[in-house]
Amino acid sequence: MKILVIGSGGREHALAWRLAQSPRVEKVYVAPGNAGTANTPNLENLAISDLNELADFAASNDIAFTVVGPEAPLAKGVVNIFRDRGLKIFGPTKEAAQLESSKDFAKAFMKRHGIPTAEYETFTDAEAAHAYVRHKGAPIVIKADGLAAGKGVVVAMTEEDAHEAVDFMLQDNKLGDAGARIVIEDYLDGEEASFIVMVDGEHVLPMATSQDHKRLLDNDEGPNTGGMGAYSPAPVVTPEIYQMVMDQIIYPTVRGMKEDGIVFTGFLYAGLMISKDASGKPTVKTLEFNCRFGDPETQPIMSRLKSDFSELIEAGIDGSLDKVIAEWDPRCALGVVLASKGYPTAPRKGDVISGVELQGDDTVTFHAGTKFNDKG
């Protein structure tokens, strides 16, 4: 079979790499891909970004199914486009993807269905938002409602920082439509973890747990990034925590979306804050939902997956995730991000990368933001 993966990052490289391991898979097209996917056996880059043109390609090239990596195509309705043409694709519809594309939608959904999350209010008026900040104090979290390329969340440790964030989004309109509405929520303390599952609309297949680390520098210092590394499994997700997440967050979310008439299919990623209450009992709250695999969490998770990933995706599309199991390498997988100088604020482009093999013993190199130069 031939498969299409949409995206260009390390996440998509890892997804395509794992799909290509299957003896059932002849070729995996990656649109648009990167230098790493261009250099990986059985993968082929596809220079198409228009969603309708991607559907044309899938229809005319006998693509068995399509997997969507990043959030932007999901928010633009790529799943709707493919399904309207009778093409198999794994991911949520534009409507269901609002769990990620609208923070206000997600918070209202969680409140309506009793899913644990931080207390919040939503604002479109800057003065009202400033008044709320003065009332609540700091630390406090300011979130743009829409997708903002990683710039939409400010963890304000002082009231001054919170007021600046409100003005940045609402008054100065620095994030455009994405920041025209903001969510202000209570600051949660504890340890974060990533909990990713596959959903077929009704059944759930959990992936291995993971934890990413966003600070740029060693010792958890420096600015936040898209992620400097991740590992799987996440020790903080004990068997007790695991069951709490499934019972209090994952199952209620899948049921709630169905009850609301917006059936969810695809990868569901719950960003968790794990802590303890006053009596010392563990608690779990939802920081956010994503409607796709995390990056860089995908890389260590895919490295541990022993099952045929293409079979799991097909089960997700066909509504039979209850008929399959995911088997994992019991060893820990660690992913470390190598970033260019100046990352994340002003990454230097054009530096030549050398001495990094695509694959060795127990080591795989996944690419993001790379391309070939004139010398290949």
Predicted segments — roles?
Residues 5, 30-31, 67-68, 89-92, ...:
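General beta-strand structural signal in soluble alpha/beta enzymes
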Residues 245-268, 290-360, 368-374:
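Active-site "cap" helix and flanking loop/linker of ATP-utilizing ligase/carboxylase catalytic domains
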Residues 1-95:
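ATP-binding N-terminal substructure of ATP-dependent carboxylate-amine bond-forming enzymes
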Residues 44-50, 121-125, 156:
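Short acidic-hydrophobic, aromatic-tinged amphipathic segments that line or gate anion-handling sites
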Residues 92-152:
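A conserved helix-loop-beta module that forms one wall/lid of the active-site cleft
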Residues 152, 156-302:
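Internal nucleotide-binding/catalytic subdomain
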Residues 38-41, 98-104, 217-218:
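Short, charged, surface-exposed secondary-structure boundary motifs
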